[in-house]
Amino acid sequence: MAKLDAYFGEYGGQYVPQILVPALEQLEQAFIDAQEDPDFRAEFMTLLQEYAGRPTALTLCRNLTKGTKTKLYLKREDLLHGGAHKTNQVLGQALLAKRMGKDEIIAETGAGQHGVATALACALLGLKCRVYMGAKDVERQSPNVFRMELMGAEVIPVHSGSATLKDACNEALRDWSATYETAHYLLGTAAGPHPFPTIVREFQRMIGEETKMQILAREGRLPDAVIACVGGGSNAIGMFADFIEEESVKLIGVEPAGKGIDTDQHGAPLKHGKTGIFFGMKAPLMQDEHGQIEESYSVSAGLDFPSVGPQHAHLNAIGRAEYGAVTDDEALEAFKILARNEGIIPALESSHALAYALQLAQAEPEKEQLLVVNLSGRGDKDIFTVHDILKEKGEI
């Protein structure tokens, strides 16, 4: 039986109850077989093109970098059906579930974007769907909850722990360990136990592949850097995957600094965490001196995750990718700037990557540089959050 690497350097692995090992082994083999099956790949590509709307555009932001010599492009995953990059890999995993003969899907969601993507894929492909969501997130993301329910998903609020994403993850895994014979756990990011980080990367890889072709067609060269926000890390690894071997291209991931890295209210485990075991993997983790998981924080629910995907941890460890952090205030400023100067309302998650790119442009205005930001999602889900913050600050 062919096997995928379970580790990226020292990170990754499969730290799960023994009962789940057969399900993960079955998933790994099904994925390997599917990747080698031209019919599966053709069905996946057809769904991406005809249902999801790929390829997505690469947009030059002419107004954002005025006064500098930076050319800034956005990879427009916000234009994908469902409103974010999540749709890509969800369609892939849902097809995989059908291939394995499973008719139920379990998922977890934070901001609700992965839940919405899972619900739409299940509606399309005729699968039953239940989504675990922290009770706090159910409150702050009510439009997405209703979207999921409209498409036939059962949304299950999780009240344990901090009632956020990490608790939803734990409940989803608990459910799967009791139902794995009929259900597939459709994990929402490039993290968790092997083989999920690899599967999610491969089902998001087209982001970087398209970007490479589009930028070569537009500019005749590769970008100096590709920049993406990092929570669990799926949109970033989707952008990075096809550029890892291109050593001239900097890979820049942006974690949420929340209210400041020097406070305890951030979500930056890569730079400020310690290695531990969480969610079935070995990875950097926000934990206290007793090894207990600390609460992560970000204005963006989708980045509010106390760990990070193992391949990002490895890319950071070997110096192939660099990871910065952007505060809530910096992300909000970038959100406003993009809306007012380009007529694009980005997700708060994506606004972190945009803020970092704008800082690079402004730091060296005379430097000619070609940057691509992965605009991983649209900001419809965030307008009420932003409205309340701006009102509190007296800006509206």
UniProtKB/Swiss-Prot annotation:
Keyword line: Amino-acid biosynthesis, Aromatic amino acid biosynthesis, Lyase, Pyridoxal phosphate, Tryptophan biosynthesis
Gene symbol of the encoding locus: trpB
Similarity annotation: Belongs to the TrpB family.
GO cellular component, one term: cytoplasm
UniProt function note: The beta subunit is responsible for the synthesis of L-tryptophan from indole and L-serine.
Organism of origin: Aliivibrio fischeri (strain MJ11) (Vibrio fischeri)
MF terms (GO), sorted A to Z: tryptophan synthase activity
Subunit (UniProt): Tetramer of two alpha and two beta chains.
Pathway: Amino-acid biosynthesis; L-tryptophan biosynthesis; L-tryptophan from chorismate: step 5/5
Pfam families referenced in this protein's UniProt entry, alphabetically: PALP
Reactions catalysed, as given in the entry: (1S,2R)-1-C-(indol-3-yl)glycerol 3-phosphate + L-serine = D-glyceraldehyde 3-phosphate + L-tryptophan + H2O
EC number, as in UniProt: 4.2.1.20
Name by which UniProt lists this protein: Tryptophan synthase beta chain
Modified residues (N6-(pyridoxal phosphate)lysine): K86
UniProt xrefs under PROSITE patterns: TRP_SYNTHASE_BETA
Origin superkingdom: Bacteria
Essential cofactor(s): pyridoxal 5'-phosphate
InterPro entries the record matches: Trp_synth_b_CS, Trp_synth_beta, Trp_synth_beta/beta-like, TrpB-like_PALP, TrpB-like_PALP_sf
